[in-house]
Amino acid sequence: MSASLAILTIGIVPMQEVLPLLTEYIDEDNISHHSLLGKLSREEVMAEYAPEAGEDTILTLLNDNQLAHVSRRKVERDLQGVVEVLDNQGYDVILLMSTANISSMTARNTIFLEPSRILPPLVSSIVEDHQVGVIVPVEEMLPVQAQKWQILQKSPVFSLGNPIHDSEQKIIDAGKELLAKGADVIMLDCLGFHQRHRDLLQKQLDVPVLLSNVLIARLAAELLV
C-alpha cells in the first residue's frame, strides 16, 4: 500500500508551491490538505478565534490574503482535535505546515512533524557557526523569530520583506540589508516564500538561501519513501 500524508495548516498556504516538493516521492492522490481556518471568512475566524485581552496570539494568513492575530490557545486546542481525527484515519505522516512556534501536540500512531520543534536544530546543524540572516514578512513577527532561532551559535540578524505584498526588488533589498549586517546565509521562514524567492536571492546575492518549507517537505518526503 502506498504511503499517505496529511498536510495540516492553520490558515492559507500556497499548496501549489508545496506539492511539487512531495510528488517526486509520493503520489498526489495520497496527499490530503486540511486547513483549520482556510475555508472560514475573516468574520467567522474572529468570532471563533479572536484572542482575549492579554492572551498569546498566532499571526496567520486568512483567505482574504490578509494576516490576522488569533488565539494561540484556541488554535492549538482545535489543531490537536484535527490531529487526533487524522491519526485515527491511518495516515503514515501528518505534517504541520506552520512557522508559528507550536510544539505541544501529539499523535498516537502516525509520525507527526512539527516544524518549530524540528527546524531550528536542523538549521543549526547545517549552518554551524555561520551568521544567519532571516527575512521576516512583518515587524510583528520579529520577537517570535528571535525566540525561535535562539539555538543558533550566533544570534541571527533580521530584515523585513513580505513575499505576498512586496516587489522582487524589495525582497532583494531585504537580503542586501542582511549581508550588510554580516549575514552569509539567508533564511526564509515564512510559508509565503517559495522556490522562486530562494532562486532569486541566491542569484542576486550569491549566498546560500534556506527555505523552511522546502526543508520540512523534504524531510516528510524522506519518511514516506
Curated annotation (Swiss-Prot):
Residues spanning the membrane: none
GO molecular function: racemase and epimerase activity, acting on amino acids and derivatives
Role played: This protein of unknown function is encoded by a gene that cotranscribes with the aroL gene, which codes for shikimate kinase II.
Official protein name in the record: Protein AroM
Species of origin: Escherichia coli (strain K12)
Origin organism lineage: Bacteria, Pseudomonadati, Pseudomonadota, Gammaproteobacteria, Enterobacterales
Gene name in the database record: aroM
